[in-house]
Amino acid sequence: MNKLLLDFFKFLFSLIPLFFVQLIGILVGHIFHIFNSKTRDLLVDNLTNSKIYQNRKDLKKAINRNIGETGKTILEGFSIWLSKESRILSWVKEVEGLDGIKKAQENNKGIIFLTPHLGCYEITSIYYGSKYPLTILYRPPRQKWLINLIKQGRQKGFNTLAPTDKSGVKQILKALRKSEAVGILPDQTANKGEGEWVEFFGQPAYTMVLVSKLAKKTGANVIMAFGERLDIGKGFKIHFKTLSSNTVSSPRK
């Protein structure tokens, strides 16, 4: 992305309060939903097949809310990538589970943070990486113009990105052996030959085995991280939950 254009967007997003970022995000989500039939059909199929909702009214509400939350995720992502660290941290209103992190750090075996695509997942790494070293495994996007934006946006504080290839896995292992933390998005489809088929809500899902292998090899503590959205414009609550070794021993757990 052209530096002048990038600087313009940084300036623009610095002027937009979180309330309007999320409000515009809801609108973007609905526009995207209208024009992207593949994503729309996938969302409807997934929520229908989950069988969580007992009637069509509840299902329709869930679909509409999901559309809005997806839009928020997109706009929040850009806002986080383009904003200063201090501004992003001001959006964090509460943090739960810091005792688990402290205990994990005292074990000196490293931490594997699992951050699924729920809520504002971008803010969890910015929060931890503002205090301690964090190596984040990430899959470069197909859109080339996004690569530098994501690298600059996520590598704030003590954060470092590692690609999803052999060199990236080596970076992850090196960080864990130094008793540092790493971040992994566990709900991405694994590369061919690097996953295991498991049943998820009655559907087959090809799930990564990297986390269970890393935990077994290094003895690292595994902690789930989640950025919960509070009321619109009110910021986020970050949750850290330590997982048992049995839970992460296999994707089937």
PLM regions: where:
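Membrane-anchoring hydrophobic helices of lipid-metabolizing enzymes
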Residues: 1-115, 149-151, 156-158
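Soluble catalytic domains of membrane acyltransferases
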Residues: 81-253
